[in-house]
Curated annotation (Swiss-Prot):
Family per record: Belongs to the venom Kunitz-type family.
PROSITE patterns, alphabetized: BPTI_KUNITZ_1, BPTI_KUNITZ_2
InterPro entries attached to this UniProt entry: Kunitz_BPTI, Kunitz_BPTI_sf, Prtase_inh_Kunz-CS, TFPI/VKTCI-like
Free-text tissue specificity from the UniProt record: Expressed by the venom gland.
Site annotation Reactive bond for trypsin: residues: 41-42
GO CC, one annotated term: extracellular region
Organism: Hoplocephalus stephensii (Stephens's banded snake)
Classification of source organism: Eukaryota, Metazoa, Chordata, Craniata, Vertebrata
Location of the protein in the cell: Secreted
Cystine connections: 31-81, 40-64, 56-77
Keywords of this entry: Disulfide bond, Protease inhibitor, Secreted, Serine protease inhibitor, Signal
Protein name, entry field: Kunitz-type serine protease inhibitor stephenin-2
Chain ranges of the BPTI/Kunitz inhibitor domain: 31-81
Length: 83
């Protein structure tokens, strides 16, 4: 391959890297878990990361059990899972 072809390939790979969003391999695995309100009957505002919509969404948390995809603030959810 000529040096021009190699430079073109390098440029295309660099562009691909820049345009590719953060990979799911870079976020914690628990960010892929579904929202889980838990087994208690509380009524607490919480947030979870929805991997299909690529955003943090609100849900009602019961106050116990559930899973790790559960954040008190949307900012905490974004910092952990959507970055």
């Amino acid at each position: 391959m000529s040096s021009g072809g190699l430079l073109l390939l390098l440029g295309l790979l660099t562009l691909l890297e820049i345009l590719t969003p953060v990979s799911s391999k870079d976020r914690p695995k628990f960010c892929e878990l579904p929202a889980d309100s838990g087994s208690c009957k509380g009524n607490f505002q919480a947030f979870y990361y929805n991997p299909d919509q690529h955003q943090c969404l609100e849900f009602i948390y019961g106050g116990c059990d559930g899973n790790a995809n559960n954040f008190k603030t949307i900012d905490e959810c974004k910092r952990t899972c959507a970055a």
